[in-house]
Amino acid sequence: DAHNEDEEHAEGS
């Protein structure tokens, strides 16, 4: 469920 602002673009985290 990557619909949280933190996970939607968390690729290089």
From Swiss-Prot:
Keywords: Capsid protein, Clathrin-mediated endocytosis of virus by host, Host-virus interaction, Viral attachment to host cell, Viral penetration into host cytoplasm, Viral penetration via permeabilization of host membrane, Virion, Virus endocytosis by host, Virus entry into host cell. It comes from the Viruses. The keyword Methyltransferase does not apply. It is found in: Virion. GO terms for biological process: clathrin-dependent endocytosis of virus by host cell; symbiont entry into host cell via permeabilization of host membrane; virion attachment to host cell. One of its GO terms (cellular component) is viral capsid. Capsid protein self-assembles to form an icosahedral capsid with a T=1 symmetry, about 22 nm in diameter, and consisting of 60 copies of size variants of the capsid proteins, which differ in the N-terminushe capsid encapsulates the genomic ssDNA. Capsid proteins are responsible for the attachment to host cell receptors. This attachment induces virion internalization predominantly through clathrin-dependent endocytosis. This is Capsid protein VP1/VP2. The lineage of its organism: Viruses, Monodnaviria, Shotokuvirae, Cossaviricota, Quintoviricetes.
